[in-house]
């Protein structure tokens, strides 16, 4: 025993104690597979760890969802940015469309300038134009006493041909005719049948005058016949009015017999009339005939 208490023995004892301690600590883990007591504890530890894991998983899912929601939040304000882009595209497209419109206007102006034609025509040659025109407006010109007339082609509705006619200031016998655009149809063959022609106006005036002349002729003939018929009756009544104005003879109201007229003829044949009475050449045949007609009508 004394030999065992040297330095080497102490070192050996310490190493043995440490090895034994390690073996004792590790041994329950090895024997836990066979010992049911330790197995129950391991199962309870496993169950508790699973429960803790189950309790922890919702928080992890919520954290994941919240992380995704945080990622989605900046995406929402991006939507109006996407909506603004079509507006910019529409604005850019509008600018693009506006460019050809300006080019079209410039082209149309160029076309008008190219198709414009100015001619100096005498007053006598204005009616010799091959095309048919209709006047649709008139406008005064500054510094000129003569107005300017505007004409369009009357042959076709879709024709864009126009004409401007104005009298020359320096030479009033000359006219300045400006043609714009071109005709899209052939020249008309019959000018009399065109709308807006002034050749038919005299015929219309003649037709308008003819009813008045016929009415005048019809109205004049009955008046003259009535005058010729009425005037002799007035003369005869004035001659037969011997007693006064109250005893006028009315053939329509009285019935006269034939003996009365025979007595009148004998009375007219004698010389019993004075100087103020009717002459001997007075003929009562007209009165007799008229009285006969009235009696026959009654």
Swiss-Prot record:
Residues 75-116, 181-220 are annotated as: Disordered. Residues 107-116 have a biased composition (Basic residues). Residues 88-103 have a biased composition (Low complexity). The keyword Transcription applies. Residues 122-188 bind DNA. Residues 190-220 have a biased composition (Polar residues). One of its GO terms (molecular function) is transcription cis-regulatory region binding. One of its GO terms (cellular component) is nucleus. Gene3D superfamilies: WRKY domain (2.20.25.80). GO terms for biological process: cellular response to hypoxia; defense response; leaf senescence. The keyword Transcription regulation applies. Keywords: Activator, DNA-binding, Nucleus, Plant defense, Transcription, Transcription regulation. Induction: Induced after flagellin treatment. It holds the Pfam family WRKY. It is found in: Nucleus. Acts downstream a MAPK cascade and therefore might be regulated by phosphorylation. WRKY 22 and WRKY 29 may provide redundant functions. Belongs to the WRKY group II-e family. Transcription factor involved in the expression of defense genes in innate immune response of plants. Interacts specifically with the W box (5'-(T)TGAC[CT]-3'), a frequently occurring elicitor-responsive cis-acting element. Activates WRKY 29, SIRK and its own promoters. This is WRKY transcription factor 22. It comes from Arabidopsis thaliana.
